[in-house]
Amino acid sequence: MLTVQNLSFAYGAIQVLDDISMGMPEGRITCILGRNGVGKTTLLMNIMGLLRPTIGAVYMEDRDLTDLPADKRAAAGLGLVPQGRRIFPRLTVEENLKVGLSTLGRRASKIPGEIYDLFPILKTMSKRMGGDLSGGQQQQLAIARALVGEPKVLLLDEPTEGIQPNVIQQIGAVLERLVKERGMTIVMVEQYLDFVKEIGDRFYLMDRRRVVASGLTSDLNSDLIHRHLSV
């Protein structure tokens, strides 16, 4: 479904990503792991088109997205939930969700009922300002806003960061449901290993700008964790 091919990226003279290749299969949850500062967020931004790689390519369903800007990639079926949620605090929950409809152009003007089915709390709080929500509720809103755009591939950057355990469980259940019912492809940067092992199918482990290991999440062993994830 989604392929990153020999992708490198630099901020000026500072190399951040070096020859990254990944394949994210359709209808699976692929987790990107690594310590802080290894380039995970930068990789997602390159996939989404918010940054342009120095060299390399990004494909979705064999379509080359490399030269497309972020809005065209969104229209092609990519959705991003950025780190830190980035909801609009002075818009209501409903207005935040309607922002996600812009991806669909004139095809839709109403929030799908399924969104509120996935996140019932958002229906209850639809008239509340986004800034009044708790951190966990804001994360649910950020995910819901991305889903309004009907992505085929959902990119999430640390969706459990700063979130209480019960909301993490709810988010995990939603992601598993999206895979099971929609066949959605999910790519998730994540540091919470218990969450990765619970819902993830495959992983790529990054260190020093490169992919150093990959496989099934069940293959994540103590040696890999100690060498590449322990602080």
Q: Residue locations for each model-derived region?
A:
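Helical segment within the ABC ATPase nucleotide-binding domain
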Residues: 169-182
